[in-house]
Amino acid sequence: MGEELLVYDSVEICFNGRPAVRDVSFSLSPGEILCIVGESGSGKSTLLRAAIGLLGRAGMVTRGDIWFQGENIPDLPERRLQKIRGSRIGMIFQDPAASLCPVRTVGSQMTESLRAHGPISRKEAKERSLALFDKLGLKGGERIWECRPFELSGGMNQRVGIAMAMLLNPCVLLADEPTSALDAVMGRQAVLELLALREHFGTAILLVTHDMGTAAAMADRILVLKDGTAAEYGPAGQVLAAPKSRYTRELLEAVPSLE
């Protein structure tokens, strides 16, 4: 597997015995951004959640392997997966409400996240969080720390979600449609912040999107999914400039301009 951090090898995922993803293989290297692109229902988010064992009771990896730093994720007990989540693999959800309690302060939630992986004082947690806010360009860190998510905009909550996911400096970040609930301006801001994570921390990012334009702006490699199978996979420049799949060409035609 060489330098690869995350390797999906001929993966099949079923829900209640029915395949949602079939025979999908790809890998993610340190510092790389890999975008998984496809329409709703193609299996993108399912692939992402499988990397941290969040398929729910009905979901199961029924064939293949998902290797992360020498460990096969489908074989790991829940206790081991809990150690990996956050500290080694972080995740940004499509809806910030999925990861933030609306009535507890951002500071209390960030402190709790840090304490789940080791003892830390509230003062130390605040210092670490404010330093991260500053690196990510979030102005007014003190105010954000004291706010409850319902007092912040959707765009700011998404940015807080990015900060939460990076608290423990994981080597891999999973991002599930991080721009889909944002307007165009905030969507561009989220893209820039994700690119900054790689620049500042060397984070490898596995990003799910239905928007080929977002993939064009970010990806080193692209995996195109259609009905749970890989329609195309390769370097972003190659997939964008000379797509082999008709489905990939259709997705590209839906993007007004990649300039």
Task: Give, region by region, the residue ranges found by the protein language model.
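The feature captures the beta-strand-to-loop junction immediately N-terminal to the Walker
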Residues: 37-39
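Conserved ABC transporter NBD signature motif
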Residues: 60-72
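Conserved ABC ATPase signature
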Residues: 148-152, 156
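A short, proline-enriched helix->beta-strand linker immediately N-terminal to the Walker B motif
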Residues: 167-171
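H-loop/switch region of ABC-family ATPase nucleotide-binding domains
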Residues: 209-210
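A short, surface-exposed alpha-helical micro-motif characterized by mixed small hydrophobic
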Residues: 215-217
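ABC ATPase "signature
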Residues: 230-234
